């Protein structure tokens, strides 16, 4: 299929900010992909990008295990922009000098522009930027000039405009760099000559054609959860092939209040899709009886979901394709060799090997925020598009310890009150995620002149851009008070409310 847009590729050298670079570029209306630093020059030629960005990274170019790239990339004649480690790598390649700094520089710095190369066109001579480096460039490669300096960094920016090579020691992709977006824009449009052409309207048009070409007259199966990703996948594929799509919705009894009914109403009645609802509450609860360990709960829920889905899928004939809501973030993160497992991933793991489906993953080039935009373009209701991130194990990991029907009801009802009041206060678009959890501890209280010994409910609310890091949300006290009063008065067996004021890190967003 003919490519509809210009592309900038980002080579990943291990920076925690590498996804931000690609996202910033997409926000400009230009498509951007993240690739491992091991990509070859030949593979890049096949992609046919307009320019390349080398990301930052934690290594030293001279250190053991330093990451390098295919040197033939520099012979492609494409504009290259090196950020932090990327600039140091470029310096090393062209014979400049990189040394260990006297002390690691981390935080804001004032940048002074000394040479107005295309990268700094129409930008102020002084600007605040974000530094995060242990090495620095101390000697320019031949043919390069100093573009910018800072107090601790005599070569904070450099360029060889004859070869369209640029480097900066700071991180323009981070919002703390006040003109960072403009600087990246200057590279994308001013240096690479890109045109805007990446938007959801074009994406839908191209993706619908791709789905029709791939599927032909065959049938597609989709596991529908009611979450944003699976909902957008289902609606997009249904728009492409109509009744050739069948969705299976498994109600495992761990959903939020009104969620199961809402899914059936929206997709079966609203979009007129073929949705098979499976009531598996009893099956899941029997498997979870007496289980307290959070990892064990996750595995049981994940495995049982696969078995239920497998049972239902085997009843259907002629299903050739399986649709999944894999996002670009999932692909990028699954390729990170150094990532540690903090907890099993929320999404259900691999399907049984004997399920011989071909995969369709229409969202695998999109970030989460782009999926929401796509959902709105497809006419999916706001309550689904802006639905709170919800883990695959559902309320099962918001009841700490053993799961019982009574505990589930407490979390379900308290969570419904929290969501209702947050929406009433107009905070639902400001807060990334908010929910209640039941830590399993009881405390003494007094209600109606009588002593009580009931459960404590925890409220968790965080602000974030992508969920990788998060800060606790500063919900107004009067709103918190209203939520607390309502939960204690309306939810049985609760006499105390606590608010979680821990950021991520050190805590994770979910409690289990």
Curated annotation (Swiss-Prot):
Domain Glutamine amidotransferase type-1: 7-197
Active site: 84 (nucleophile), 171, 173
Domain of life, source organism: Bacteria
Cross-referenced InterPro entries: Class_I_gatase-like (IPR029062), GATASE (IPR017926), GMP_synth_C (IPR001674), GMP_synth_GATase (IPR004739), GMP_synthase (IPR022955), GMPS_ATP_PPase_dom (IPR025777), NAD/GMP_synthase (IPR022310), Rossmann-like_a/b/a_fold (IPR014729)
EC supergroup of this enzyme: ligase
Keywords of this entry: ATP-binding, Glutamine amidotransferase, GMP biosynthesis, Ligase, Nucleotide-binding, Purine biosynthesis
CDD domains hit by this protein: GATase1_GMP_Synthase (cd01742), GMP_synthase_C (cd01997)
Entry's Gene Ontology molecular function annotations: ATP binding; GMP synthase activity
Binding site for ATP: 225-231
EC number: 6.3.5.2
Record PROSITE patterns: GATASE_TYPE_1, GMPS_ATP_PPASE
Any Pfam family matching the protein: NAD_synthase
Domain GMPS ATP-PPase: 198-387
A single Gene Ontology CC term: cytosol
Catalytic activity annotation: XMP + L-glutamine + ATP + H2O = GMP + L-glutamate + AMP + diphosphate + 2 H(+)
Subunit structure as annotated in this protein's UniProt entry: Homodimer.
Protein name: GMP synthase [glutamine-hydrolyzing]
């Amino acid at each position: 299929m003919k490519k509809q847009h210009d592309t900038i590729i980002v080579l990943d050298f291990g920076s925690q900010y590498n996804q931000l670079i690609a996202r910033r570029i997409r926000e400009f209306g230009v498509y951007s992909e993240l690739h491992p630093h091991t990509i070859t020059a030949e593979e890049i030629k096949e992609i046919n990008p307009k320019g390349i960005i080398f990301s930052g990274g934690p290594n030293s170019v001279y250190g053991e295990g330093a990451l390098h790239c295919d040197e033939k990339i520099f012979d492609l004649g494409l504009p290259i922009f090196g950020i932090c480690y990327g600039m140091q790598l470029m310096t090393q390649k062209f014979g400049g000098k990189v040394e260990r700094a006297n002390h690691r520089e981390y935080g804001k710095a004032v940048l002074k522009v000394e040479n107005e190369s295309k990268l700094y066109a129409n930008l102020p001579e002084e600007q605040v930027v974000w530094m995060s480096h242990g090495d620095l460039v101390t000697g320019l490669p031949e043919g390069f000039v100093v573009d910018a300096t800072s107090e601790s960094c005599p070569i904070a920016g450099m360029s060889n405009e004859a070869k369209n090579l640029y480097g900066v020691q700071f991180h323009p992709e981070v919002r703390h760099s006040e003109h960072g977006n403009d600087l990246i824009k200057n590279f994308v449009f001013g240096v690479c000559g890109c045109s805007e052409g990446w938007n959801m309207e074009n994406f839908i048009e191209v993706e619908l054609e791709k789905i029709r070409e791939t599927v032909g007259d065959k049938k597609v199966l989709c596991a529908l959860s009611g979450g944003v990703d699976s909902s957008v996948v289902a609606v997009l594929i249904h728009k492409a092939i109509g009744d050739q799509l069948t969705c299976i919705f498994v109600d495992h009894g761990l959903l939020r209040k009104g969620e199961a009914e809402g899914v059936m109403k929206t997709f079966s009645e609203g979009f007129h899709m073929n949705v098979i609802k499976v009531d598996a509450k009893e099956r899941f609860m029997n498997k979870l009886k007496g289980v307290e360990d959070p990892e064990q709960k996750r595995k049981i829920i994940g495995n049982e979901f696969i078995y239920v889905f497998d049972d239902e899928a085997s009843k259907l004939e002629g299903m050739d394709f399986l649709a999944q809501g894999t996002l670009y973030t999932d692909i990028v993160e699954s390729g990170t060799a150094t990532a540690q497992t903090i907890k099993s991933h929320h999404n259900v793991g691999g399907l049984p090997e004997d399920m011989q489906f071909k995969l369709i993953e229409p969202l695998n080039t999109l970030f989460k925020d782009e999926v929401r935009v796509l959902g709105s373009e497809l006419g999916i209701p706001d309550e689904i598009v802006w639905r709170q991130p919800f883990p695959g194990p559902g309320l099962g990991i918001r009841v700490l310890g053993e799961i019982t029907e009574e505990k589930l009801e407490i979390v379900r009802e308290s969570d419904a009150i929290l969501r209702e009041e947050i929406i009433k206060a107009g905070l639902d678009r400001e807060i990334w995620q908010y929910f209640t959890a039941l830590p399993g501890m009881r405390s003494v209280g007094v209600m109606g002149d009588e002593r009580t010994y009931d459960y404590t409910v925890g409220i968790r609310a965080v602000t974030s851009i992508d969920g990788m890091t998060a800060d606790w949300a500063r919900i107004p006290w009067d709103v918190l008070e209203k939520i607390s009063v309502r939960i204690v008065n309306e939810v049985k067996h609760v006499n105390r409310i606590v608010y979680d004021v821990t950021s991520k890190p050190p805590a994770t967003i979910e409690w289990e």
